[in-house]
A protein has these predicted regions:
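Glycan-recognition and catalytic cores of secretory/periplasmic carbohydrate-active enzymes
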Residues: 1-390
Length: 390
């Protein structure tokens, strides 16, 4: 396992070397969705997700500089007010994600002190109407997920009711037709009238939120909704590479993706976690079939990242090892981690870790070093470190 430790150390060295000290804290120049450089707070591919790796790297190594960088990154993100995409709501694209990262860091101290930004962002969410986006990436499923995390931390009923408020609104947007039960990303159809299947924008991500809400409340209403959504996904599962995979949108047949955001790697993780949340072992069998497809696809996108690459599929293997105890899945996670190590670039300035575009390097979470590095940490300690955004 020394090679995994060395890989995590390499990711940290890249993040530490590229950190920029500014009056507000620490920031990094990351790469946006169109492959252009940016300074942005978002968790998805901005500065906001970098502390997720740094926090757990600190726990693994005791490196206090990693924690300093993580706290400085949060401080900068809270202060950042970009001219574009300055969303206050949503976990991966909005400031709710920074509040979620604050929660993740707060757990280190054991003091019970809650970062004030968690409360202020929650108050902002509660002050506005619910909607219009449904998904887990940064819609109401993500906001409901944040409320559940905040309720777990504080026990305050206000936050549980916030999660229920999100769930009720999503329930009102559900469509039941020949495709099954689903919701559109935006009920007004601006994202199209054909529903997505996957974790980021689709049925799987919304099902995950409802399963967690049932686990928190014991309310059979939410279990029934989770069931409907998961059963829809089972209906649309397509045999592929010896396992199961999903098209990007329900009802389509083309299998274009098998990754964390779209396809078996992310959807399998939802089924694995739902098996525990709903107490149903059959769901774990679906997760294992998704895992088989993800393994057989291998490095089909030719990158190490969480969103589209090896780390995203490897994370499913870690989850399957945790839930089944079958060491085959841990071995597969280690195999994918070692494939991901091969993408490290040793440049004159030091080690660099790529995005899913060859020749571009970034410290961010979904498309950069932090997500890849966190997968290394989870592969090292699969029973200790959790997926922080799931």
């Amino acid at each position: 396992m020394n090679d995994l430790i060395a890989a995590a150390d390499s990711v940290y060295s890249f993040i530490n070397r590229t950190a920029e000290k500014v009056p507000e804290g620490y920031r990094w120049k990351t790469v946006d969705y169109t492959d252009h450089p940016q300074y942005h707070f978002n968790v998805f591919n901005g500065v906001g997700g970098i502390p997720l790796f740094l926090r757990d790297y600190h726990l693994l190594t005791g490196n206090t500089r990693a924690l300093e960088l993580a706290e400085g990154a949060v401080a900068w993100c809270i202060s950042d007010n970009p001219e574009v995409c300055n969303h206050q709501r949503g976990v991966q694209l909005g400031k709710t994600g920074i509040a979620s990262v604050c929660l993740y860091l707060d757990g280190l101290s054991g003091s019970g002190t809650l970062h004030p930004f968690c409360q202020s962002n929650a108050a902002h969410l509660l002050s506005e109407p619910v909607g219009p986006i449904t998904d887990l990436l940064s819609g109401e499923a993500s906001n409901g997920w944040f409320f559940l995390k905040l309720w777990e931390r504080t026990g305050a009923d206000l936050y549980l009711q916030g999660a229920i408020r999100c769930a009720r609104w999503i329930s009102e947007q559900l469509i039941r037709d020949e495709l099954g039960t689903y919701c559109l990303v935006n009920p007004d159809g601006s994202w199209g009238r054909v529903p997505y299947a996957g974790l980021s924008h689709g049925t799987a991500g919304v099902a995950h939120f409802f399963a967690l809400l049932f686990q928190a409340t014991g309310d059979a209403t939410w279990k029934a909704v989770a069931h409907e959504l998961l059963e829809t996904l089972v209906r649309h599962a397509i045999p592929d590479h010896g396992g199961l995979n999903w098209s990007i949108k329900l009802g389509e047949k083309a299998l274009l993706r098998c990754q964390h955001s779209h396809g078996a790697s992310g959807i399998g993780g939802v089924f694995a976690k739902a098996s525990a949340a709903l107490g149903e072992s059959d769901l774990l069998k679906v997760a294992a079939m998704a895992g088989e497809a993800a393994y057989q696809y291998g490095d089909f996108r030719n990158n190490p990242t969480l969103c589209t690459g090896l780390a995203g599929s490897g994370e499913l293997f870690v989850e399957l090892f945790k839930f089944t105890g079958n060491e085959m899945w841990w071995d597969r996670a280690k195999e994918f981690a070692r494939l991901a190590m091969g993408y490290k670039a040793s440049l004159p300035e030091g080690d660099c870790w790529p995005t899913d575009t060859a020749g571009l390097y970034s410290a961010d979470y979904a498309y950069g070093a932090s997500g890849t590095g966190h997968f290394f940490l989870r592969t090292l300690r699969p029973l200790e470190f959790e997926m922080p955004l799931l």
